[in-house]
Design a protein with these regions (language model features):
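Peripheral, non-AAA+ core regions of ATP-driven protein-machinery
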Residues: 1-211
Length: 211
């Protein structure tokens, strides 16, 4: 059986500074399991159950094989549930259920509910502020977090409602209607988690409305 490895970009935050996280997913032979390595915190380890349910309830097949996901760099602790979405996308790409094309230029963030819906999380703004320096210009995240991400000038923001919508965008190779384009810098009254942010990006259209 051929071993397949996918790579999906995500973000982490240390203090108020964001950094790039590469989510590598290996699917191979062996006893069925789903392991996450790379200093995952408790919420990250619990992603195994959320991702498994979300994938199955979104109309996809969760692979009954040995799955190992690595969150690189491996020497920095990873916290929070925002790695749910990149983990799910990485598994589906490694299993050949969605194409890998857009994965090399998009960044994914978002907590998954058991039915495949996307939930917002904290720390989106400082994470996304790091993207221009990293040379990445597109982020896919929960629709309720799109306003925060739109505070980053020039950033293409895809606010999505569920995993199925994300996968449709990946299959199409583009965000619906060009996504939302960031047009301003974060204001001085906004905290590290974007509290106080107001949407100023021009909305060209999301794939689906917020649930």
């Amino acid at each position: 059986m051929r071993v397949v490895v996918s790579r999906v970009f995500s973000l982490g935050v240390t203090g108020v500074e964001g950094y790039l996280v590469t989510v590598e997913v290996d699917i191979g032979p062996g006893l069925p399991c789903f392991e996450i390595v790379g200093l995952p915190g408790r919420a990250v380890r619990e992603a195994r159950d959320r991702v498994r349910a979300a994938v199955s309830n979104s109309g996809f097949t969760f692979p009954v094989r040995r799955i190992v996901a690595n969150l690189a760099p491996g020497d920095i602790p990873k916290a929070g549930a925002l790695y749910d979405l990149p983990l799910a996308v990485g598994i589906l790409a490694a299993d050949g259920q969605i194409p890998e094309g857009p994965l090399e230029r998009w960044v994914f963030l978002g907590e998954l509910s058991l039915d495949g819906g996307l939930r917002p999380g904290r720390g989106v703004l400082p994470m996304c502020l790091s993207l221009p320096a990293l040379g990445l210009g597109t982020v896919v995240l929960p629709a309720d977090s799109a306003c925060e991400a739109a505070a980053v000038p020039g950033l293409e923001v895809g606010g999505m409602s569920c995993l199925a919508d994300v996968c449709r965008a990946v299959e199409a190779g583009r965000l619906p209607h060009g996504g939302r384009r960031g047009t301003r810098q974060a204001g001085p009254m906004e905290g590290a988690d974007g509290v106080g942010a107001r949407p100023t990006g021009t909305l060209h259209g999301d794939l689906a409305e917020v649930e």
